[in-house]
């Protein structure tokens, strides 16, 4: 598929506020949710619609509804911070969860939790995580979701960087990636530059 950087003045402004090291957890969360909400319009531009008969106060007519359920899959824990913004526009979206951790010695990604929704294989699935760095967590999450039988998957993040983008597209060419920003590079320790710092810590006020 493809990588899409959503360059919108409102998104750029809010992301700049999030990058500042002095930004409070409250303001960080609020801007994160607002950006996620703004991204929804582009992410769901290609949803299929189904014609239905509806009745207005004046007459019967043809209306349209999204043809499949939408499922959001946050990668724990930072991905949770993006849910509220998306759910404000899609309150009927179902929520699945995937928990991953990285082995500090081998650097391998391991699953510690996964909970899917009913009929997820017939849904539009959006995996959300604020950061796409090496692509290890994203690839693992996509593997899990595909194991549930899902065919229509998109990965949505706040900031993305190479080699993560290429790693995901190479392994999963059928998955679209959306980001608010394509950042410059990874540091020697694997941090995104300029990045946001540790998104999970900044969302939840932990260290």
From Swiss-Prot:
Its EC number is 2.4.2.9. Belongs to the UPRTase family. It comes from Mesoplasma florum (strain ATCC 33453 / NBRC 100688 / NCTC 11704 / L1). One of its GO terms (molecular function) is uracil phosphoribosyltransferase activity. Allosterically activated by GTP. Pfam families: UPRTase. This is Uracil phosphoribosyltransferase. Keywords: Allosteric enzyme, Glycosyltransferase, GTP-binding, Magnesium, Nucleotide-binding, Transferase. Binds 1 Mg(2+) ion per subunit. The magnesium is bound as Mg-PRPP. CDD domains: PRTases_typeI. The gene is upp. PANTHER family: ADENINE PHOSPHORIBOSYLTRANSFERASE (PTHR32315), URACIL PHOSPHORIBOSYLTRANSFERASE, CHLOROPLASTIC (PTHR32315:SF4). InterPro entries: PRibTrfase_dom, PRTase-like, Upp_B, UPRTase/APRTase, Ura_phspho_trans. 5-phospho-alpha-D-ribose 1-diphosphate binds at residues 77, 102, 129-137, 198.
């Amino acid at each position: 598929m493809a990588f899409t950087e959503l360059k919108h003045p409102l998104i750029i402004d809010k992301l700049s506020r999030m990058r500042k090291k002095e930004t409070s957890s409250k303001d960080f969360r609020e801007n994160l949710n607002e950006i996620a909400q703004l991204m929804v319009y582009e992410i769901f531009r290609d949803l299929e619609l189904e014609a239905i008969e509806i009745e207005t106060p004046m007459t019967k007519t043809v209306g349209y509804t999204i043809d499949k359920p939408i499922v959001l899959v946050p990668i724990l824990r930072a991905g949770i911070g993006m849910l509220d913004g998306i759910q404000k526009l899609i309150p009927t979206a179902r929520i699945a969860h995937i928990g991953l951790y990285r082995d500090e010695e081998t650097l391998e990604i391991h699953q510690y939790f996964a909970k899917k929704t009913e009929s997820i294989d017939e849904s539009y699935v959006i995996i959300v995580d604020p950061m796409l760095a090496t692509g290890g967590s994203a690839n693992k999450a996509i593997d899990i979701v595909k194991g549930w039988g899902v065919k229509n998957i998109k990965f949505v993040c706040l900031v993305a960087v190479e080699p993560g983008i290429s790693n995901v597209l190479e392994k999963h060419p059928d998955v679209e990636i959306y980001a608010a920003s394509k950042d410059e590079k990874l540091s020697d320790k694997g941090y995104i530059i300029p990045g946001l710092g540790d998104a999970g810590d900044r969302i939840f006020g932990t260290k």
